[in-house]
Amino acid sequence: MHMSEIMEMLIRRGFLWQSFEIYGGMAGFIDYAPLGNNLRRKIENIWRKYFVINERAAEIDTPTIGIEEVFIASGHATSFTDVAIECENCGRVYRADHYVKEKLGIEVDETVEAVKEVMEVYDLKCECGGRFKDPAPMNLMFSTTIGPGKGKKGYLRPETAQGMFVDFKRLANFFREKLPFGVAQIGRAYRNEISPRQGVIRLREFNQAELEFFVHPGEKKHPHFSLYAKDVVKLVDKFDSQHEITLEEAVEKGIIANQILAYFIGKTRRFLLEIGIKDEKLRFRQHKDVERAHYATDCWDAEVLTSYGWIEVVGIADRTNYDLKRHSKFSGEDLSVFVPYEEPVKVKRRKIVPILSKLGPEFRQKAKKVAEALEALNVEADLDEVEVEVDGEKVKVTKEFFEIQEVEEEVTGEKVIPHVIEPSFGLDRITYSVLEHAFDKDVVDGEERRVLRLKRWVSPIEVAVLPLLSREPFESKGMEIVQMLREEGIFTDYDDSGSIGRRYRRFDEIGTPFCVTVDHQTFEDETVTIRDRDTTAQVRVKLGELPSILKELLRSEKDITEFGEVFRQV
């Protein structure tokens, strides 16, 4: 099976189209055609079932444009880069590690130094024969201006996550500061890829589904881990060692850093299998230290084997509290939560007691804020002076303005900045992978048949109603059945063009699991046939029972033979 054969079918049948096609198109952009859009929406809704409803998470929707301060704080303004190489002759720009792998067949670390060394050793040249300039980092964010004139600098978001971190104070209040809690978002993100060459695999505008699961830094166990603990998963660790092991064992042996990461690996695997990813073509690979994102301490990718090779479709990262700490520092807001102890405890501590009679004359209108900043400090030893921050300004305070006392206090809890475990899903790659894994060919009645063996619950068109003959009363009866099924919430299409066999093949190719045929017997006894896409078997059922039978079939993997005797295969 070649990717060009699959893409030809997806374009021709209305799953994916090239964006801006009448103007020649542009790499890195695709349009979801009617069938592809419906498929992706169904995948999104199953994702919601797993990661919003079952996790009791809150789903929010934040702007796709962010102000510059957000991305300075997050680190994207300086760290969200790929190494690029530009040809001195033709001016083409390539992503360095991809170009090296394509031309030399070797992996190279994504650093300027490593790329430069490979270029020199192998005398790497452009496809036009020209020489490259020295490699340089390129930021992948799209910049924009917010407002008229010079306006305010902003960026198209490179991930949905930052909107959830920026809203953390409100979200913590929404959850009454009770950890753990999850926040989800589905939406568009943007990355100005240097040289996107892999169709739907590397896009400049793409769809993400992300969950930020906020936890106590010292409590990385999940109360429902037992649901997935015995699941056997295929793992490739950061040393390239392969394991086929239960998640429980992987945590015990230290292969996976903590139970919550393992829990979401298990949940992700179940989700991918439910939407149609094949288990034998699914693995989880741990990031090597050199490739791990700047914010992560551990990260596992769900990778799917396709005609492009192994591609990452999900990243599951322990981001610690990097993001919240950064946004707290740059915004000046307290992004901690108060975690109460089961029982109050008494602790001795050294505290700074400001001498207010001296602070006033010295610091005047700032005296109150200086005093509050002093009282908030934790001290371990006697100090001659301390430095506090007041209104963004560093202020030095010598020991004549304060005393250090040892006090015993009753403490009812502690303030912590939560850690976050993040499963991040690339919906476009997932949608394409589902389609490729479903693509199949077989022989029926001596002819080759193309069929998308999609899971019934993700098929963009669930049922097709086909009149045996393209004339009355078959057509009007067919449309009557279509209306009945649509009112029951079943995605139903109607087709009376061409032979019945040709129509079956058309719906097989787009993955429609069931075809309902109106034939001569329909008018004799109010029955119709249901044809199964995968087996081509047909059974006859009563028209009045059709909606309930189809609903039961569409939400399960039941065989149609449970509802009638097979009398024909075509």
UniProtKB/Swiss-Prot annotation:
A biological process from GO: glycyl-tRNA aminoacylation
CDD domains referenced in this protein's UniProt entry, alphabetically: GlyRS-like_core (cd00774), GlyRS_anticodon (cd00858)
SUPFAM superfamilies linked to this entry: Class II aaRS ABD-related, Class II aaRS and biotin synthetases
Reaction(s) catalysed (UniProt annotation): tRNA(Gly) + glycine + ATP = glycyl-tRNA(Gly) + AMP + diphosphate
GO cellular component: cytoplasm
Localization per Swiss-Prot or TrEMBL: Cytoplasm
Uppermost EC category: ligase
Record EC number: 6.1.1.14
Pfam families the UniProt entry points to: HGTP_anticodon (PF03129), tRNA-synt_2b (PF00587)
GO molecular function, one term: glycine-tRNA ligase activity
UniProt keyword annotations, A-Z: Aminoacyl-tRNA synthetase, ATP-binding, Cytoplasm, Ligase, Nucleotide-binding, Protein biosynthesis
Domain of life: Archaea
Annotated residues for binding of substrate: 95, 159, 206-210, 422-426
Keyword Ligase applies: yes
InterPro entries noted in UniProt: aa-tRNA-synt_IIb, aa-tRNA-synth_II, aa-tRNA-synth_II/BPL/LPL, Anticodon-bd, Anticodon-bd_dom_sf, Gly-tRNA_synthase/POLG2, Gly_tRNA_ligase_arc, GlyRS-like_core
Statement: the UniProt record of this protein carries the keyword Protein biosynthesis: yes
Binding site for ATP: 191-193, 201-206, 312-313, 426-429
Assigned protein family: Belongs to the class-II aminoacyl-tRNA synthetase family.
Function: Catalyzes the attachment of glycine to tRNA(Gly).
Protein's recorded name: Glycine--tRNA ligase
Organism name: Archaeoglobus fulgidus (strain ATCC 49558 / DSM 4304 / JCM 9628 / NBRC 100126 / VC-16)
